[in-house]
Amino acid sequence: MKSKVIKVALTGGIASGKSLVSDLLEIHGCKIIDLDVISREVVMPGTKGLQELVGTFGKSILSSDGSLDRKNLRDVLYKKGRNRALIEQILHPKILHKMKAMMDDCHEGVMIVVIPLLVEKELWGPFDRAILVDCENETQIKRLMERDDIDSAKAKTMLLAQASREQRLRLNEHLPTDVIENNSRVSDLKEKVQALNQKLFAFL
């Protein structure tokens, strides 16, 4: 059945290239909702999200200007296993509430919702399809080391905190899934995204 809007979840492992793919899809006319962006908005100074984080972990997670120091929060997250659960308990309901409100405001076209933890949190319910940005683990580690200026051990720890590549590749058991491999040149990725964009708009 033809629909005025198609809801597509975009996911992938850390440093797989999700942001680049979503940027390219936006250029081609897709509407983008990015949970990484929302996650920053719900911890802006003065928000309940930031107040609850400070109440739980103390002012050491704040920068000198009162904003969230994301590096310090990340250190807290990896220090104790239960800290991750506490952070998620505080932030995830706020993020998902804002995501739903933004999705409800979109009534036509191709809607792309970037959800890094789609597989881990089994959030496929609202969506018609999925896009999985996939790359080799070694590529992720290299990109993480360059992007975050960390060593390989820290990068591997960050990878282990997420679903495995194999788990993500089973996403098609829950949603029709287009896999975009991102192991090579940006020019190759652009061609793949352009073809996928044409496929998605054909569903409308």
Q: What residue ranges belong to the model's regions?
A:
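Short gly/ser/thr-rich secondary-structure transition/capping motifs
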Residues: 93-97, 111-116, 157-163
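Walker A (P-loop) phosphate-binding motif
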Residues: 1-37
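An amphipathic alpha-helix signature
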Residues: 24, 28, 50-54, 137-145, ...
